[in-house]
């Protein structure tokens, strides 16, 4: 862990990397308000079949792009998911910028406005942004925190946002809920 609370990670999925469509409980997916998927688990073969099956039966879908290396590795597939199959997308600014080959954040906003999806982007010290249809919602960071390790902050952010979203909070309130959760890291 560096002094600014950053870290270097190398994931090993173990048996999770062997998930396939037989592991998807269709009834559980149908019963869920939102089916959340992790970019870390997406891969060709069995995992792709599992994602496709879950997406087919889901009421709403959400996915985290998870990591810049995942975006680089699966760029075309992730772009297809974002454009055509997902309802809510979570990413940090670097991940989303890389996904769409944006020059700057204005390009990200312009691209996202045209999708008709909910794009949620964390921006580090710049806070977070949600873009839904043509509207942009911004939320600042919580201050005066003594963060030691940022591992899991994005996961907590997504869980807080989704908690707000399924409980009919506004997009702005859902961003704040995500910020509050990620601040507990």
Walk through the language-model features, giving the residues of each:
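Residues that scaffold the ATP/ADP-binding catalytic core of kinase and kinase-like folds
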Residues: 10, 99, 185
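Conserved N-terminal subdomain of the carbohydrate kinase-like
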Residues: 1-37
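Short, acidic/turn-prone active-site loops that include or flank metal/cofactor-
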Residues: 13-17, 66-67, 94-95, 142-145
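Conserved beta-alpha-beta core of the PfkB/ribokinase-like small-molecule kinase fold
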Residues: 34-109, 117, 126-128
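Short, charged, surface-exposed secondary-structure boundary motifs
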Residues: 19-21, 72-73, 99, 146-151
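Conserved phosphate-binding/catalytic region of the ribokinase-like
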Residues: 57, 76, 104-185
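Structured loop/turn residues at beta-strand edges in well-structured enzyme cores
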Residues: 27-30, 84, 114
